[in-house]
Design a protein with these regions (language model features):
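Histidine-rich, glycine-flanked metal-binding segment
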Residues: 25-28, 37, 41-77
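Metal-associated gating/positioning segment near the N- to mid-region
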Residues: 74-143, 205, 228, 233-236
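His/Asp/Glu-enriched, well-ordered alpha-helical/loop segment
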Residues: 99, 216-218, 286, 297-383
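Short, acidic/polar
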Residues: 107-115, 165-178, 225-230
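Divalent metal-dependent hydrolysis catalytic cores, especially in the metallo-beta-lactamase
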Residues: 108-134, 148-159, 181-193, 220, ...
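Active-site gating/metal-coordination segments in enzymes
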Residues: 156-208
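Active-site core of metal-dependent hydrolases
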Residues: 189, 195-299, 317, 322-324, ...
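C-terminal cap of metal-dependent C-N hydrolases
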Residues: 352-354, 358, 371-413
Length: 413
């Protein structure tokens, strides 16, 4: 990881030299005029203005001026949050996942590119779960040295197999190790991949230890779980269940009663694997049998999202599981949820705004357009409530008061 930091430093130098191309930052006060504004919590405002000072929103005032950015005619909303991504995954020089023969420098460039295209797609915060190489990328972006979304990382996940798995005490030690390595959240695999059948890989006792230790350290827990592992993760007190395919309605009701978040993936990740089958097949963990299983999983995912959406009080957040081939296309998951699962478009938007922020413990900082929140603001050419494909047309991106994308005309003082 030390050499990865060196390579990212090289990228930083290049970014600093080219910064006027990538970002437009106005010191002091910025006023954005909007015609249609989604506040991130389900409310729509019309014909108003957003006032920003530094990195924060300080007012919503229809009389504020002068206007710096005129976004009337567009749909303005908080920057999206992807609760489940793998920002360092990329295809290598051989075209394959993981990239046999790829140098550390090439991996660092690819990670920086993934971060950039994700930001350009309107995602101003992501949870990358996880890889140790997330850490230097997260830190470079947080310091403003590289452009990209705000990153929360799990560093190294507890896999449920191999050397990380052991007694409850050994698992607690592993969780502490991730905290020391800079983890923002803990990722736990309680099930095998759905490509290997999705069977449970941790006992209830092991899950209890992992989730309890994380809680003692002030860390949230995301648990990769299918079938019976969904209930086990919920009983263990995890923060969020990832995937959740084949969970029963009773499992989902238990999650709602416990306040456990659900992060299902309706389509993008499976569609991406199938689209890039030749680039994954034969790499570790990707077999012909696994792809046959994935071809059957989409209807199951759609069924889960439909059923989960009907469970009162169940908090469903937006996560894509974006891997190599999907970075920058994260918003396709919105289309899958609305088109294939019948999710209300505004519910889909808030799942990637205030609800995802709440799941990350950042509900008072990001995910809403209101005074006191980070100025993470995007604009779409179109209205996603009428045409969900508008999520593909992100024409303006601001993160923390810095404008990184501005395709509409700009009004300057």
């Amino acid at each position: 990881m030390r050499f990865m930091k060196f390579v990212l430093l090289f990228l930083v130098i290049n970014f600093v030299l080219a910064k006027p191309i990538f970002a437009q930052h106005k010191q002091g006060r910025i006023v954005i005029a909007v015609g249609t504004l989604f506040d991130g919590k389900g409310k729509v405002l019309h014909n108003t203005r957003i006032v920003i000072e530094g990195s924060k929103i300080v007012a919503i005032d229809p009389k504020a001026g002068p206007v710096d950015y005129d976004l009337k005619g567009l749909t303005v909303l908080p920057g999206w949050i992807d609760a489940h991504a793998h920002v360092t995954w990329s295809f290598g020089p051989d075209g394959k996942n993981g990239g046999a023969g790829r140098t550390t420098a090439e991996a660092a460039y690819a990670a920086a590119e993934n971060a950039w295209v994700t930001l350009m797609a309107g995602f101003t915060t992501i949870q990358s779960v996880g890889s140790p190489t997330d850490v230097p990328l997260r830190d470079a972006i947080a310091k403003g040295l590289l452009p990209g979304p705000r990153i929360l990382t799990a560093v190294e996940p507890l896999t449920g197999r191999g050397p990380q798995t052991g007694t409850p005490d050994e698992i607690r030690a592993f969780i502490r190790k991730q905290k020391d390595a800079g983890a923002d959240v803990i990722k736990i695999f309680a099930s095998a991949s759905i490509r290997q059948g999705g069977g449970m890989t941790l006992s209830q006792e092991q899950l209890n230890a992992a989730c309890d230790e994380a809680k003692k350290l002030g860390l949230r827990t995301l648990v990769h779980a299918y079938k019976e592992a969904v209930r086990a993760a919920t009983i263990a007190g995890c923060t969020q269940v990832e995937h959740g395919t084949l969970a029963t309605d009773d499992d989902l009701k238990l999650m709602a009663s416990k306040g456990t978040f659900l992060d299902p993936q309706a389509g993008l990740v499976i569609e991406n694997y199938l689209l890039n089958k030749d680039r994954y097949l034969g790499t570790p963990g990707y077999t012909a049998e696994g792809f046959a299983a994935m071809e059957k999983i989409l209807p199951m995912n759609h069924d889960l999202v439909r059923r989960a959406s009907k469970i009162p009080g169940l908090r469903i957040v937006f996560g894509t599981d974006a891997v190599a081939g999907a970075h920058g296309r994260n918003a396709e998951e919105f289309i899958d949820r609305v088109r294939d699962c019948g999710v209300d478009p505004m519910v889909a938007m808030t799942s990637a705004n205030s609800l995802a922020a709440d799941a990350m413990g950042l509900g008072s900082q990001i995910g809403s357009i209101a005074p006191g929140f980070e100025a993470d603001i995007i604009a779409l050419d179109g209205d996603p409530l009428k045409d969900i494909t508008a999520v593909r047309r992100v024409v303006f991106v601001m993160k923390g008061g810095v404008v990184y994308k501005n395709e509409p005309h700009e009004v300057r003082r």
